Amino acid sequence: MTTAIAAPRRTSARAASSTNLNRQSRPLATASRLPQSRLLHIVAPSLKVPDAAAASVFSAVRTRGPIARDAVAQLTQLSIATVNRQVTALLDAGVLRERADLAVSGAIGRPRVPVEVNHEPYLTLGIHIGARTTSIVATDLFGRTLDVVETPTPSGSQSAALATLASSARRYLSRWHRRRPLWVGVAVGGVVDSATGYLDHPRLGWVDAPVGPVLAEALGLPVSVASHVDAMAGAELLLGAPRSAPEAAGAPARTSLYVYARETVGYALSIDGRVHSPASGPGTIAGLPAQSELLGGSGQLESTVSDEAVLNAARRLRIIPAEGPSSTLAAVLRAARQGNDKAEELLADRARVLGEAVALLRDLLNPDDLVLGGQAFTEYPEGLPVVEDAVARRSVLGHRDIRLTAFGNRVQEASAGSVSLGGLYADPIGAMRRAQTRRSAAV
């Protein structure tokens, strides 16, 4: 599938840097907002491990199904009566189905008939809006990617860019004739007001952009909008390796630090199965001090380790041509793997700077788990030992294992998928009701 979106607008490095330093202290604007009626179908993202009864039952079936009701009760530590009620409600909502063909031989009564997720009729739509590239993702109820298209993030005026995004998403959904879309999740940089779906994105020049309302109006579906690094941390919680309910219930509260680096840098903190999302938007690490003679930059982290910084340095060092089809980050990575000493040294220095920043965050927050995501880490895993060494040398705390994201180079699509599925996983019955009501009103 292909979707045509215009090439992204570029802001000057000086303007982007200046705006980035100030964006956290300035509240989102409130002028010229859409009518309140347009905000009724914006739902704050649910980036947490579900804990309500119906959500716990659905999670058990999603991760362990086909499964009998008594096994669900053991996994969730809910009473069999509660499980029976929730399974009946989930069957009525259409998100579960019975598998009579798998019933235990000789068993009598419907409660012994296994159930599984009824995933074929549905999908959710995820949109990851990056500084340069936008990904549109179709995800099933298991959290598996059905399809993804990547296109340049639209340029032009803010209103024109949003109209282009909405039109592309609508055309994309129109191709899914056998699956009904339930929800839209948007993962995007900048400062996000998750309650209204508005955001500021300095790199794109968006101010008080009604991303959520525009998509809700165009698609006729509930929409959730989240900071993209929060969404990536949410994907680790919702779509990563599951923990059983008894294990989770008996374990102490844990914290997880997620650090992201690609064209931008960011972090998110998960506390006891929930991504910490301040109402004023995520904090920024773009301005952390960073020094590299090879990479250059302004002495701040983002301008030193971004993809653009690596490309500029590689051109200056004549690792790649100044322009043309070979003047790409992929060419830098290829040169390093083919034994180009300058390329290896450049990427190692990027890994060192990133490791020192991770050490600073680790010492400040002291998380139980430390996860690295984004192509700065995943596209060059050869640099991970350098990151680990820099963390060990710079951190004043004891050793802590570091792991790469479970989603590798697919972290952008996973983040969008987690936002589109979070509401359904947290309240599957309510989500199905909301999606049906919104869809009916739009017809």
Where do the protein language model's features map onto the residues?
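ATP-binding/phosphotransfer module of carbohydrate and carboxylate kinases, centering on a glycine-rich
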Residues: 2-102, 106-148, 154-166, 170-174, ...
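Phosphate-binding/catalytic loop of phosphoryl-transfer enzymes
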Residues: 127, 141, 183-187, 191-303, ...
